[in-house]
């Protein structure tokens, strides 16, 4: 067996061929390079201008067709599709449908703003071009409601309050039931009895709170802002009423409910209730 020719093997390796065909592989490589160069020449001639430095309107969308390379725009308000850039002045003009929809929405907003309040509220309200009602109308409505409640003569109410140093407490009660028909059909005897009952409750509450009048010495005390006497008359404790089932902060010596005027309050600290 003869040894292989080393020089022939080396020359075949240099030509990337083992059959001695010399230069076949090099020709294929040159063909591939030429085809790639030709393809790059074709792609260099295609450019697409996106104008991304200018923002589109909020209801427009910019799309690109991959097959044709065409850029088109879709208006999501009416579903139209166009190749004209909506950022230009001629294409950005609103369509008649959008103009009519916006005008109708503004009319509805103005109607809601005018219909929401009557009387003084309508006179004080101001409607802007966007259809919103100013805050002054809300204040007028609140003032009108307060005036109506203050001038309503069908109900009765009472209130009380007391303060001590830097501490204070207040309570109010309105005896109206809110039914206009029932209040208008009530007899004179029921109104007189209710007024007498309310006056008796008011006198009981006044007599109870009169014992809790702060003195000049205690009001001018330092520290926490109140002073406690020897008998504990100026100490606030939690108490519950058996009649109206409510809890109040009342003086320790008080025994009358500040709401209904009934006696026998359950002082939590005195009777040991938890």
UniProtKB/Swiss-Prot annotation:
Single biological process term from Gene Ontology: cuticle development
Molecular functions (GO terms): ATP binding; helicase activity; hydrolase activity
Source domain of life: Eukaryota
Motif (EAR): 47-52
InterPro entries: WW_dom_sf, WWC/KIBRA_Hippo_Reg
SUPFAM superfamilies for this protein: WW domain
Keywords: ATP-binding, Helicase, Hydrolase, Nucleotide-binding
Disordered: region residues: 17-44, 83-133, 175-216
Domain WW: 54-88
Compositionally biased tracts (Low complexity): 87-106, 121-133, 184-207
Record's function text: Negatively regulates the cuticle development probably by interacting with the HD-ZIP IV transcription factor HDG1.
Quaternary structure, from the entry: Binds to HDG1.
Protein name, UniProt field: Protein CURLY FLAG LEAF 1
Taxon lineage: Eukaryota, Viridiplantae, Streptophyta, Embryophyta, Tracheophyta
């Amino acid at each position: 067996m003869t040894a292989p020719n080393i020089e022939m093997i080396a020359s075949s390796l240099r030509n990337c061929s083992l059959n001695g065909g010399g230069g076949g592989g090099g020709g294929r490589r040159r063909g591939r390079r030429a085809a790639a160069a030709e393809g790059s020449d074709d792609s260099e001639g295609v450019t697409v201008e996106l104008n991304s430095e200018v923002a589109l309107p909020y209801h427009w969308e910019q799309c690109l067709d991959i097959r044709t390379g065409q850029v088109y725009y879709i208006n999501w308000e009416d579903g139209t599709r166009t190749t004209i850039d909506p950022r230009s002045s001629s294409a950005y003009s609103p369509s008649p449908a959008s103009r009519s929809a916006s005008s109708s929405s503004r009319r509805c907003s103005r109607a809601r703003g005018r219909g929401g309040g009557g009387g003084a509220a309508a006179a004080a309200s101001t409607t802007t071009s966007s259809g919103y009602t100013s805050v002054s109308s809300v204040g007028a409505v609140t003032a009108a409601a307060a005036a109506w409640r203050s001038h309503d003569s069908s109900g009765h109410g009472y209130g009380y309050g007391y303060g001590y140093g830097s501490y204070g407490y207040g309570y109010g009660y309105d005896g109206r039931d809110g039914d206009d028909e029932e209040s208008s059909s009530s007899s004179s005897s029921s109104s007189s009895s209710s007024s007498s009952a309310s006056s008796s409750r008011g006198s009981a509450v006044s007599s109870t709170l009169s014992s809790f009048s702060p003195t000049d010495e205690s009001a001018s005390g330092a520290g926490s802002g109140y002073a406690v006497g020897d008998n504990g008359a100026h100490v606030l404790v939690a108490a519950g009423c058996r009649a109206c089932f409510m809890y109040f902060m009342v003086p320790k010596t008080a025994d009358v409910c500040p709401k209904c005027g009934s006696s026998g309050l359950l002082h939590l600290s005195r009777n040991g209730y938890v």
